[in-house]
Swiss-Prot record:
Disulfide-linked positions: 45-51, 47-190
BP GO annotations: killing of cells of another organism; lipid catabolic process
Residues that, per the record, bind Mg(2+): 25, 27, 85
Compartments reported by the entry: Secreted
Protein name: Dermonecrotic toxin SpaSicTox-betaIIA2
Family classification: Belongs to the arthropod phospholipase D family. Class II subfamily.
Length: 275
């Protein structure tokens, strides 16, 4: 999965897909009551990027629904995963449950259309810190109460704050979640980062019987040398400001026979096993 980073304006969706992304990440900004208002990152953000691009969240969802709906004039078959970077650290943890309810409701109304011609992409809920775990409860409770638990099959969970992997597992156990779990590791592109935690996450992913990590990705990679380093460790995905650079690295002799771009036929919730 090549994840375009910080794709917050509607016009950026096609831009990042044209560069080779098959997944996009966008930031969800909440008001003080936990209501999702805009796709917006804000200052500071990655080096060399404009931090202020934004859209109304519901309008953004309406657009990506079209982009991921076969038969729609805007349809792009390559876009198979939407990563929602939930800026919950900007609001009180007490509002996390309400935020989960609100995001689920808006996805039902504007993305899935409650079963009527909705978008087909998989959804990854990127939650910054384990203390915000109530978001997941609010989200799942809403799908159940609204009679649309079928969408759980499309939804995954990812804690992105580089917290202790065992602490993350404990929270997932508490929630009763042991499927559809990704693990991110990374830092803003402005700073270097070692691979210690990334390697630990990959080791857990590859441990037989370990349920709490099915995919691992590294972020936010801009240098080809760091992309190569991550690929040599066998990550499942790379988040980048420059998807075209990732595409270029994947075409290199070292990687061309080992990796390919994920398509809609690839299940993002299953551990990859080579045939």
């Amino acid at each position: 999965w090549i994840m375009g980073h910080m794709v917050n304006a509607i016009e950026q969706v096609d831009e990042f897909l044209n560069l080779g992304a098959n997944a996009i990440e966008f930031d969800i900004d909440f008001d003080e009551n936990g209501i999702a208002k805009y796709t917006h990152h804000g200052i500071p953000c990655d080096c060399g990027r404009l931090c202020t691009k934004s859209a109304v969240f519901t309008e953004y969802l309406d657009n990506v629904r079209q982009v991921t709906s076969p038969g729609d004039p805007k349809f792009r078959k390559e876009l198979v995963l939407l990563a929602l970077d939930l800026k919950l650290q900007r609001i009180s943890s007490e509002k996390a449950y309400v935020a989960g309810v609100d995001v689920a409701t808006k996805l039902l109304d504007h993305y899935w259309k409650r079963g009527w011609n909705g978008g087909r992409a998989y959804i990854l809920l990127n939650i910054p810190l384990v203390e915000d775990y109530e978001f997941i409860k609010g989200f799942k409770d809403t799908l159940r109460k609204e009679g649309h638990e079928q969408y759980n099959a499309k939804v995954g969970i990812n804690f992105t704050g580089n917290e202790d992997l065992d602490e993350i597992r404990k929270v997932l156990e508490k929630l009763g979640e042991d499927e559809h779990i990704w693990q991110a590791d990374g830092i803003t592109s402005c700073f270097p980062r070692g691979t210690d935690r990334l390697e630990k996450a990959l080791e857990k992913r590859d441990t037989p019987g370990y349920k709490y990590i099915s995919k691992v990705y590294a972020w936010t990679l801009v240098r080809s040398s760091i992309m190569r380093r991550s690929l040599r460790l066998n990550v499942d995905g790379v988040m980048s400001n420059y998807p075209d650079r990732v595409v270029g690295v994947l075409k290199e002799k070292e990687f061309a026979d080992k990796f390919r771009l994920a398509t809609y036929a690839d299940n993002p919730w299953e551990k990859f096993t080579s045939i």
